[in-house]
Amino acid sequence: AGPDGDFYHGDRYIGIDKAITALPQVRPVRGDLRIDGELFLFAGITGRRFWPQSNLSLRVRRDGQTLQDDFSHEQCLVVSQDGHRVLVSGCAHNGILNILDRYRDLFGGDPDVVISGFHMMKKQPYDCEKLDVIDETARELARHNTVFYTGHCTGLPAFERMQTILGEQLRPLHSGVELDLATR
């Protein structure tokens, strides 16, 4: 097991390949880590505003027990360069608003750019409650002077709905796209 346990979606293992964790150059990181003057890695996201309900099917096996994954291991990277800060996240299992709250606790303001999934993709149509969460998340993001690039696990219906609120503040991200972050 890894330092935080083994991760599963149902019965399917979705954690890091054990061959990778065995490599001598791989260093497990817990908590926050300043890598250098430009790179800062953080975890410790504890907020639960609009915590994605799709997380409920994700589990961790730790000390012989299978538990709901709390995503305390989820890490985000902040790249600081030329007076700008870019926040990079993966699927945002903790919820993008909670990740931004933690970022603001650490840095005292908003990032210039966020590159992240929003973990809103669904196989079934959204019900009214989920649509309200998408809208409220977009309204909250619109209050910040940040450009958001998302794709991946956000899902096209959620992206399109959020873009009606965020406009050019929300931009699509696809494999192979090159971002010129200097021009935002």
Role assignments for model-derived ranges:
Residues 1-75, 167-184:
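Metallo-beta-lactamase
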Residues 70-76, 80-175:
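Cap/insert and terminal regions of metallo-dependent hydrolase folds
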